[in-house]
């Protein structure tokens, strides 16, 4: 076995030390946003297996923006959002003394954006140790709204986090006029564009897509954190049913 020496590695080399995941399927009884991030962050800190109290060294807390906190998004969840400074709320819940509070813009690229930004700041000696957290509690939040249950999830610790990332609107005025905002309305346009490009019939496109998603589901069936850890056949994907609706 090769003896690997790290003596020539700079002290400011970014290293991912620990991580954790959490899937909460308790529906209306699930975690709120802050509880969820706090729980998974505790597990990530423990995963670092540090010999001393790592919490004392975390000087930066970064959080990936939630869908429910997307600016200009006309939805009940946006109107009820009650966490104006989630990085500080999370820091307080973990008894951290982080002096840097970072919150990303909305986007599928935001987790990687945050990783890159934190790594660069560590490299440039701007920060020493960072905690990055993100997740969604929409299943619980929307479920409680549907059942008329209390949804006063909020914490206002004061201050304003630093915002990183581009905040460009994902749709223009014409697209908004036609309701083209949520993925369920936009993705079918992409699918039909691909079908046209490939000169396929609707049936041919469905069969190709079903084969792709069967492979995805096969991978998910082996992942304990998958929302649907079930291996579904192509036939299930080409046969619409009420159980296919996930929102």
Language-model features, listed with the residues they occupy:
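Active-site-proximal alpha-helical scaffold in enzymes
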Residues: 105-136, 181-223
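Accessory "access/gating" subregions that flank catalytic or transport cores
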Residues: 229-239
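Short glycine-rich phosphate-binding loop at a beta-alpha junction
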Residues: 58-64
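Condensing-enzyme catalytic core mediating Claisen C-C bond formation in acyl metabolism
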Residues: 2-38, 155-180, 187-219
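Conserved catalytic cysteine-centered active-site region
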Residues: 9-10, 25, 65, 69-129, ...
